[in-house]
């Protein structure tokens, strides 16, 4: 038995360390619950040695070029598969069929050209399918019809020129942005429950009413960066809208109250980068629930009819997005100034409703504007001039009259002789002549191309937001969609950090996430605790200014629940490394104790054999003849002490030998038991 210990020890060590060493593919990181991150691995195929109990597999940015029928064999429990940012050009028929439990599939940023009826065969439980940023030109009719449980479908940034009818009764989000779909046929969307529809950057000139006839549950509509010349009339019928994005439709030069009537539920409105010179005066009446307004990069004419805007923003609960880019264009005395920084007097409103006679040596020049009925009159003191001094003759102030006809680039957009043109995605831009600078060439340069002393308001850091909400007493869901949309850097991976603010352990925990995730659930938290969560780009060097978003959330008290959401686990294999190491140390200690016991037992058995007359290793000539020499009393025997055998066993020996001639057998020693 003891001789087998050296053979069993390596086997026991292999069994103890096997799951931690052999269960994770090379170049990957494995963590619980059953999540494999292959972020540093480079290979043209999917790793083959993935543990069969894997729930989440992340192989983004691995250089994968092809998939075959056996790429995902032996992974029946896989629920989340991230293949984004690879070089996959085609998907074999039925390649995902072994993944019967797959719910999330991310193929963003590959080189796919076509989607067939067999591409997603067998994915009956698929809920999220991301196909954005590919080269897809053709989708066969019925390619998604078998995906009965699909909730999100993203096809943005492809090369689609036509779209087959979509019959997805459970779909909640559909993103078709930035394709070449110049028109969408009525009835093409059989998605009665869709909540968010994104049609940005398609080049649409109008929206057909039949397109929205079945969208009874629409809350979020994005039609930005198109060629719309006015607010589509069909929008008035979407009374459930809470978010509307019209940004980048540079041909829209006017917002009429009747265009937006019936949208009382609206909470977020984006009318930035249009050609607006004014805004409807009754925004609070039109949108009583409005929380966020974006109106940046419009050529506003900051005269009296617009004087209500600043006080309304400051006094209401509405947040103005990008206030540093919401500036005046006209008149020249206000050009380039922040709209929120203007006082009532800066808008050139008449002091009274009647003409006042004020002694002055200069002629009175009034702005050709009408007094807003909602503004209270302001009385002038006798020492104050009635109006501002006339503008320099080189640039005459514009008058308030009929809004010009919609054009690609509205007239008088650029000041001081600047040339207006449309930039990328139809954004207005001005080419300024020598000596002038600014968004609309409103600032004059001095000698030596030094800017004029006009105060320039420093641009505050951008505010990126996170949506954090509790999922269970031990988990928080972090919404990354707004952060990804608002970030100005190219994101490949994200760093998510969190810490417990209400507990004794406030150590920072860091996770690495792919940039393709729209949300992430942080698990293994403490119930009834407040956590701080931050997200930032992952990369060497310092985080760019304004690219870190943080938020706080509180987990609810503990409740009995049998459901735990399947999410990605923490990065790092520290628990998997500690457990095998402790097992190895314990096995080594047990082996050492067993070996020592075997050695002592062997020596004791050898001593017993010698006492019984067996020939031992140290037998003399007389013992070979069958004659045993009597024990001679040694020095220790005369002292009455015990004598130690060569084998190490302690024995009792007689105090005196037999006086005979030595023919009788001596008294044998009795070893201790």
Curated annotation (Swiss-Prot):
It is a single-pass type I membrane protein. Expressed at highest levels in aorta, at intermediate levels in kidney and placenta and at lowest levels in brain, heart, liver, lung and skeletal muscle. Within the aorta, the strongest expression is found in the tunica media of the proximal ascending aorta, the descending thoracic aorta, the abdominal aorta and the coronary arteries. Within the kidney, expression is found in the interstitial cells. Residues 597-673 are cytoplasmic. PROSITE patterns: EGF_1 (PS00022), EGF_2 (PS01186), EGF_3 (PS50026), FN3 (PS50853), LRR (PS51450). Pfam families: EGF (PF00008), LRR_8 (PF13855). This is Vasorin. Disulfide bonds join 409-420, 414-430, 432-441. GO terms for biological process: cellular response to hypoxia; cellular response to redox state; negative regulation of epithelial to mesenchymal transition; negative regulation of transforming growth factor beta receptor signaling pathway. The lineage of its organism: Eukaryota, Metazoa, Chordata, Craniata, Vertebrata. It comes from Homo sapiens. It is found in: Membrane; Secreted.
């Amino acid at each position: 038995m003891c001789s087998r210990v050296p053979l069993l020890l390596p086997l026991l060590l292999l069994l103890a360390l096997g799951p931690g060493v052999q269960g994770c593919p090379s170049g990957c990181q494995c963590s619980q619950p059953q999540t494999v991150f292959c972020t540093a691995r480079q290979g043209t195929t999917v790793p083959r040695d993935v543990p069969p109990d894997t729930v989440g597999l992340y192989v983004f940015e691995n250089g994968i070029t092809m998939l075959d029928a056996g790429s995902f064999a032996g992974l029946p429990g896989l629920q989340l598969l991230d293949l984004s940012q690879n070089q996959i050009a085609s998907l074999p028929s039925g390649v995902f069929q072994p993944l019967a439990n797959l719910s999330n599939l991310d193929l963003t940023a590959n080189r796919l050209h076509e989607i067939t009826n067999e591409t997603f065969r067998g994915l009956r439980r698929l809920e999220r399918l991301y196909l954005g940023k590919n080269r897809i030109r053709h989708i066969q009719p019925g390619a998604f019809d078998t995906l009965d449980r699909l909730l999100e479908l993203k096809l943005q940034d492809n090369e689609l020129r036509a779209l087959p009818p979509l019959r997805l009764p459970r779909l909640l989000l559909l993103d078709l942005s930035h394709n070449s779909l110049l028109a969408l046929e009525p009835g093409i969307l059989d998605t009665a429950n869709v909540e968010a529809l994104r049609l940005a950057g398609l080049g649409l000139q109008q929206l057909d009413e039949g397109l929205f006839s079945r969208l009874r549950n629409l809350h979020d509509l994005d039609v930005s960066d198109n060629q719309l010349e006015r607010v589509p009339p069909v929008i008035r019928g979407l009374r459930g809208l809470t978010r509307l994005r019209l940004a980048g439709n540079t041909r829209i030069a006017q917002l009429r109250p009747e265009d937006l009537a019936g949208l009382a539920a609206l909470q977020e409105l984006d009318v930035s980068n249009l050609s607006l010179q004014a805004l409807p005066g009754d925004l609070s009446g039109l949108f009583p629930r409005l929380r966020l307004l974006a109106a940046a990069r419009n050529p506003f004419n900051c005269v009296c009819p617009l004087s209500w805007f600043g006080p309304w923003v400051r006094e209401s609960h509405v947040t103005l997005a990008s206030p540093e880019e919401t500036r005046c264009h006209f008149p020249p005395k206000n050009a380039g100034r922040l709209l929120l920084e203007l006082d009532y007097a800066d808008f050139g409103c008449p002091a009274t409703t009647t003409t006042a006679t004020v002694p002055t040596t200069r002629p009175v020049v009034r702005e050709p504007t009408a007094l807003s009925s909602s503004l209270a009159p302001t009385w002038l003191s006798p020492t104050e001039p009635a109006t501002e001094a006339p503008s320099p003759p080189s640039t005459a102030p514009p008058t308030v009259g009929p809004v010009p006809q919609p054009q690609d680039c509205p007239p008088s957009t650029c000041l001081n002789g600047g040339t207006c043109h449309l930039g990328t995605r139809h954004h207005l831009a001005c080419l300024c002549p020598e000596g002038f600078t600014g968004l609309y060439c409103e600032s004059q340069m001095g000698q030596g191309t030094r800017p004029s002393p006009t105060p320039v308001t420093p641009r505050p850091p951008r505010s990126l937001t996170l949506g954090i909400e509790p999922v269970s007493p031990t988990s928080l869901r972090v919404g990354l969609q707004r952060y990804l949309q608002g970030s100005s850097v190219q994101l490949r991976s994200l760093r998510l950090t969190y810490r417990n603010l209400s507990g004794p352990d406030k150590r920072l925990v860091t996770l690495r996430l792919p940039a393709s995730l729209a949300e992430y659930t942080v698990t293994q938290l403490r119930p009834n605790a407040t956590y701080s969560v931050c997200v930032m780009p992952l990369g060497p060097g310092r985080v760019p200014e304004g690219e870190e978003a943080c938020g706080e959330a509180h987990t609810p008290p503990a409740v009995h629940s049998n459901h735990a959401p399947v999410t990605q686990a923490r990065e790092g294999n520290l628990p998997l490394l500690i457990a095998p190491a402790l097992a190895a140390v314990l096995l080594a200690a047990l082996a050492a104790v067993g070996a020592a016991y075997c050695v002592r037992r062997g020596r004791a058995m050898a001593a017993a054999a010698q006492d019984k007359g067996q020939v031992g290793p140290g037998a003399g000539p007389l013992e070979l003849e069958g004659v045993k020499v009597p024990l001679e009393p040694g020095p220790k025997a005369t002292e009455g002490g015990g004598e130690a055998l060569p084998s190490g066993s302690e024995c009792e020996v007689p105090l005196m030998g037999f006086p005979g001639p030595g023919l009788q057998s001596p008294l044998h020693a009795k070893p201790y038991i």
